[in-house]
Amino acid sequence: MRTLWIVAVLLVGVEGSMYELGKMILLETGKNAATSYIAYGCNCGVGRRGQPLDATDRCCYVHKCCYKKLTGCNPLTDRYSHSLKNKTIVCGENKPCLKEMCECDKALAICLGKNVNTYNKNYKITMKMFCKKPDAC
């Protein structure tokens, strides 16, 4: 299990907003982002795109579309701040792009939490070759 965690960290990275996103996902779903969503479906994980396989995968698809709208920041390297108020994620950035990035991540975490019952262990590691071309965002 420890080896899997190390590999997941290397694949996902802990720099930039990925660390914050992982914390948000854990809060909303109770699941570890690196071990549960690294290669889930056709859209969860870096560099993955395809027709969503279920509601959980659709959350990741919408998140990628949200990231595509960002200008002036990089989700893999830039960091933002957020806090919790009454168990609610609050994005606390003054820079517009970082605030938008935080809002994208917050929306993903909330979506995954609302759809945690659709999580299908059979989609946990989906090969790209089984994913159909996605619709445009």
Swiss-Prot record:
Annotated localization: Secreted
InterPro entries per record: PLipase_A2, PLipase_A2_Asp_AS, PLipase_A2_dom, PLipase_A2_dom_sf, PLipase_A2_His_AS
An annotated GO cellular component: extracellular region
Keyword Disulfide bond: yes
GO BP field: arachidonate secretion; lipid catabolic process; phospholipid metabolic process
Keyword list, A-Z: Disulfide bond, Myotoxin, Secreted, Signal, Toxin
Region annotation Important for membrane-damaging activities in eukaryotes and bacteria: where it falls in the sequence: 121-133
Pfam families in UniProt: Phospholip_A2_1
Site (described: Hydrophobic membrane-disruption site (MDiS)): M127, F130
Any one GO molecular function term: toxin activity
Site (Cationic membrane-docking site (MDoS)): residue numbering on this chain: K128, K133
Disulphide bridges: C42-C131, C44-C60, C59-C111, C65-C137, C66-C104, C73-C97, C91-C102
Tissue expression as described in the entry: Expressed by the venom gland.
Site (Important residue of the cationic membrane-docking site (MDoS)): K121, K124
Signal peptide: 1-16
SMART domains to which the protein is assigned, alphabetical: PA2c
UniProt-listed PANTHER family: BASIC PHOSPHOLIPASE A2 PA-11-LIKE (PTHR11716:SF101), PHOSPHOLIPASE A2 FAMILY MEMBER (PTHR11716)
UniProt similarity note: Belongs to the phospholipase A2 family. Group II subfamily. K49 sub-subfamily.
Function: Snake venom phospholipase A2 that lacks enzymatic activity. Is myotoxic, and displays edema-inducing activities. A model of myotoxic mechanism has been proposed: an apo Lys49-PLA2 is activated by the entrance of a hydrophobic molecule (e.g. fatty acid) at the hydrophobic channel of the protein leading to a reorientation of a monomer.
Known partners and oligomeric status: Homodimer; non-covalently linked.
Protein name, UniProt field: Basic phospholipase A2 homolog Bsc-K49
Classification lineage: Eukaryota, Metazoa, Chordata, Craniata, Vertebrata
